[in-house]
């Protein structure tokens, strides 16, 4: 059996934030969520998250994840002290324990699976992940013999000048036989520069300790400040965009595009520069997104084009033309072959197939049928100062420019509303509606001097 322990008790002082460091977002998920997800391939029997700073907030943020256990570390006295908190909850556990840091979010599941496999295949007491860094400053150094068996681990601040020339660093990721670790943890001392309990000192009490180098040292990047968080985001984005381009998605100027790894894309999607895809969005084949668009938590059906527009929490049907400068939001549903154009906002509305609203309109809390044409400047006046009200427009109806529909109101099918009208009453099918003051010409209206 395998258990996982995630160290997530620290404050993260260098983040300059009240938010616990492990809860800072990285591409749509918190740092610690990404660490938890990286354990998927080893299928752990138990996942223990060690919390401390603002523990209740961390627990609440992770409450949606199943089978997660929390262990509190009331004082933060080092990594060894954090793992000592497992002695009671894991007192009856038999198997191996993987130790991960909650602020190292880029580890691939395959890397953790390889670590566990190496550990078990070689019957090690402990196996630690290492990396060869071009600049290892700040990391503990790992010293091994010719068989990758560890002879010594020295924290950076405790290294002498000769030891600091070693580029093999400790990534802070371990797999231990729990029985060996549990026996060694009470023996830790604070005899070091930081006066803390170092988990690495457990190695002194293990007979066989092996190091395994990670293939890509970027995986073990830790997050201690905003600059490192930004750098990790760039690494994550490179991975995501490479994956989708290899799957048949075209991304122009990828350095200007961001895609959350919760987004799903189908082949032959084209993503133009300065476009951002977030949340649980699904983009179907043949769509063109951008330039300059934001899609968030939305479904975009096949062969739809969205230019310089924002779509959030909504659905857009096939072969639609959206933008430029359109805002669709609030669980809106746009049908097939619709055109929604310049400076149009659609909020919490259902738009039927083949409906057009080309410019300068607000459609809120409305249901529009098929083949409706919304003239420039049409407004659904849905708010009375207290409540929102519904507007219904039937199939094939048309609103003239600068029309106002005062909700609640129902406009029937095949209705034409004259330009400049303010409609306050329901309208039957197949009517022409004129609701505006008559034009009047008054000659000689100026006073004679």
UniProtKB/Swiss-Prot annotation:
Q: Where does acetyl-CoA bind?
A: 376, 382-383, 419, 436
Coarse class of the primary localization is: cytoplasm
Q: Identify the metabolic or biological route this protein is part of.
A: Nucleotide-sugar biosynthesis; UDP-N-acetyl-alpha-D-glucosamine biosynthesis; N-acetyl-alpha-D-glucosamine 1-phosphate from alpha-D-glucosamine 6-phosphate (route II): step 2/2; Nucleotide-sugar biosynthesis; UDP-N-acetyl-alpha-D-glucosamine biosynthesis; UDP-N-acetyl-alpha-D-glucosamine from N-acetyl-alpha-D-glucosamine 1-phosphate: step 1/1; Bacterial outer membrane biogenesis; LPS lipid A biosynthesis
**Which InterPro entries does the annotation name?**
Bifunctional_GlmU, GlmU-like, GlmU_C_LbH, Hexapep, MobA-like_NTP_Trfase, Nucleotide-diphossugar_trans, Trimer_LpxA-like_sf
Superkingdom per UniProt: Bacteria
Location of the region described as Linker in the Swiss-Prot/TrEMBL record: 227-247
Please tell me where UDP-N-acetyl-alpha-D-glucosamine binds in this chain. Answer: 7-10, 21, 73, 78-79, 140, 155, 170, 224, 329, 347, 362, 373
Which family would the database say this protein is a member of?
Answer: In the N-terminal section; belongs to the N-acetylglucosamine-1-phosphate uridyltransferase family. In the C-terminal section; belongs to the transferase hexapeptide repeat family.
> How is the quaternary structure described?
Homotrimer.
Tell me the protein's name: Bifunctional protein GlmU
This chain's source organism reads Picosynechococcus sp. (strain ATCC 27264 / PCC 7002 / PR-6)
Q: Which gene encodes it?
A: glmU
């Amino acid at each position: 059996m395998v258990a996982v322990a995630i160290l997530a008790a620290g404050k993260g002082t260098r983040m300059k934030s009240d938010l616990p460091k492990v809860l800072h977002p990285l591409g749509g998920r918190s740092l610690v969520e990404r660490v938890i997800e990286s354990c998927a391939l080893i299928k752990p029997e138990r996942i223990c998250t060690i919390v401390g700073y603002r523990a209740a907030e961390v627990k609440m943020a992770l409450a949606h994840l199943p089978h997660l256990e929390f262990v509190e570390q009331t004082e933060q006295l080092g990594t060894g002290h954090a793992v000592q908190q497992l002695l009671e909850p894991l007192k009856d556990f038999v198997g191996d324990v993987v130790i991960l840091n909650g602020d190292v979010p880029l580890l691939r599941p395959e890397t953790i699976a390889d670590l566990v496999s190496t550990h078990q295949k070689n019957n090690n007491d402990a196996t630690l992940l290492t990396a060869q860094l071009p600049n290892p400053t700040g990391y503990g150094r790992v010293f091994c013999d010719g068989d990758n068996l560890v002879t010594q681990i020295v924290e950076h601040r405790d290294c002498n000048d000769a030891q600091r020339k070693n580029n093999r660093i400790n990534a802070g990721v371990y797999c231990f036989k729990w029985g060996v670790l549990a026996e060694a943890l009470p023996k830790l001392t604070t005899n070091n520069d930081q006066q803390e309990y170092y988990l690495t000192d457990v190695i002194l009490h293990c007979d066989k300790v092996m190091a395994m180098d990670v293939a890509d040292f970027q995986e073990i990047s830790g997050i201690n400040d905003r600059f490192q968080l930004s750098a990790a985001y760039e690494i994550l984005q490179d991975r995501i965009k490479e994956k989708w381009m290899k799957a048949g998605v075209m991304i122009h100027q990828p350095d200007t595009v961001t895609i959350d790894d919760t987004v799903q894309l189908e082949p032959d999607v084209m993503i133009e520069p300065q476009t951002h895809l977030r949340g649980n969005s699904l983009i179907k084949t043949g769509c063109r997104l951008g330039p300059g668009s934001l899609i968030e938590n939305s479904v975009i059906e096949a062969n739809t084009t969205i230019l310089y527009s924002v779509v959030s929490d909504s659905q857009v049907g096939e072969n639609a033309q959206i933008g430029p400068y359109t805002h669709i939001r609030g669980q809106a549903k746009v049908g097939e072959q619709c055109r929604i154009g310049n400076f149009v906002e659609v909020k919490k509305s259902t738009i039927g197939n083949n409906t057009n609203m080309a410019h300068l309109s607000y459609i809120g809390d409305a249901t529009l049928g098929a083949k409706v044409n919304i003239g420039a400047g049409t407004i659904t006046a849905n708010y009375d100062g207290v409540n929102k009200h519904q507007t219904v427009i039937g199939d094939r109806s048309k609103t003239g420019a600068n029309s106002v529909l005062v909700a609640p109101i129902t406009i029937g099918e095949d209705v034409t509303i004259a330009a400049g009208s303010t409609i306050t009453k329901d309208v039957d099918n197949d009517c022409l509606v004129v609701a505006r003051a008559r034009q009047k010409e008054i000659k000689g209206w100026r006073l004679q001097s």
